[in-house]
Amino acid sequence: MKKSLCVVLGAALVCAACSEKEEPAGNDPVVRSVQVASSALEILPGGSAVLPFTVEDKEASFLEVKLLLDGGQEPEEFSLREIVRGVERGSYQAVIQDAGLGRNYDRDDVHIAILPRSPSTGNDYYVQSSAFRVFSEANPPGTVYTGLPVVYVDTQGGQGIYSKEEYVKASLKIRGTEQYDGLDEVACDIRGRGNTTWYWPKKPYLIKLDEKQSLFGMPKHKRWILLANFMDRTLMRNLVSMKVASMMSHLAWTPGCVPVELVLNGKHMGSYLLIEQVRVDKKRVTVTEMTPQDNVGDAVTGGYLLELDFHYDNEVQWTDPNGHNNQWGNGIPFGVKYPDPEDLTPQQLAYIKGYISETANTLYGNDFKDPDKGYAQYIDVDSFIDYWIVFEVMGNHELGNPGSVYMHKDRGGKLVAGPCWDFDWGVLSYNTSPQARTGLVNGNAIWYGRLRQDPAFEARLKARFNELLPKLETIPDYMDECEKRLTESARLNFAMWNPAEDASQNGGYIINGDENMSFHDAVARLKSIYKERLRVIPAKL
């Protein structure tokens, strides 16, 4: 591409450099030397700069102009965009363009090289200028250029963030892109978050803005999450999973997300995913907001947001004896995420525990298949089908652990599956889910083993998968888009962080299986496993 551009420019210069009455080719003056007007040229990130130069024989014509380094190769970080003829004969301006790679560079061995128009010699040779310097400080302290938006967080007094419970006062601003708007500085609080992920070197964070803001076109809210994706060599497991979940029309809401760079207290921390927090809100999980007075009748029936998580770290939690989990066998751990623990009344807790118990007892009872007396009177079946498909297509075994699994119930309504969350641990990996090569990952997860014993449920599940398949088959193209979008971010991120350190939290074994691969090889593997899932799943339904 670079070479062909130079040839076109050179062809234009042949006409520009020749006299009006062209001499025979054999009599053309020959370029014998090239002089540059400056020994140093600074280019701003993403910009260009002009370097004037002259040729000794002002009537000389030439075929090609390019930039060459001492080794004879063309530079990667910048290129020759165009040549503009000067006012005087034999004078020109070279427009040199930054390649947009986001790198610092400082080359002092750059030459303008001209291929003369001299058919009398059978060999191509370039006449080169003396060496000159081209430099750019793409990443001065506290800045980064990868093509992604940059989130800047500065804590009060430069304090460190060491707790998942205690907030630190801070300010936040965003440098946008052509696609995404930026944000002027606003006040916020920030703390750590996550279970296992909090104990890795690259930390995830929760941000609480003082005032609701719309970030990157997502609905206004105060609370936002910065996922570190530390162990994900592809940097796209969560991104792709949320894309798949957004295709599911029976899931009420899927968190919006945008990959960003994080600069914390002036230090670039790497590639992050800014994502909406799973939280009850008119623009997120839209169940009825409760008060401590909602204790009887229809008022006590909702809304609730529940998390199923074997880590058992919710403040209000219990285990229902029915169902299957991958950690200890029987029983499902439930936690109440909404109402907040300080607002949840004993009557409300008794109601939702009773509803879960009645649902599970019916599901595991003799009449569970009955369309009127069975499980269908308690759960929104379509949402449970779509939720399972997302986990199964992505090979996410967390549904069966269970971990970061959500359900919600609105006032007067049934139990609804979702939203989807936290798809970085073992997703699309044969390391954590070897059964994915030939079978289902979540065939027996939580309540699904029992649900699939109902032929009507299994038929609906199969029909829904086949209906969604054309959409699901577009995801590899989306992965290609993400790969292009994240390439430079990945280069900088993995110069700072080693995802193979995730083995420290997994008995010495890497989790996803691609931690020691290159970014591009890891993406190719992710895409290959995804395509295999689309082939394997239909045969097992």
Q: Which residues are covered by each model-predicted region?
A:
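Proline-enriched interdomain boundary motifs that mark the N-terminal boundary
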Residues: 28-37
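Extracellular acidic, Ser/Thr/Pro-rich low-complexity tracts
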Residues: 55-59
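Bacterial signal peptide processing site
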Residues: 19-21
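C-terminal motif of bacterial Sec signal peptides marking the signal peptidase cleavage site
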Residues: 14-17
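Short, solvent-exposed loop/linker segments at the N-terminal edge
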Residues: 41-47
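Aromatic sugar-binding surface patches on proteins
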Residues: 86-97
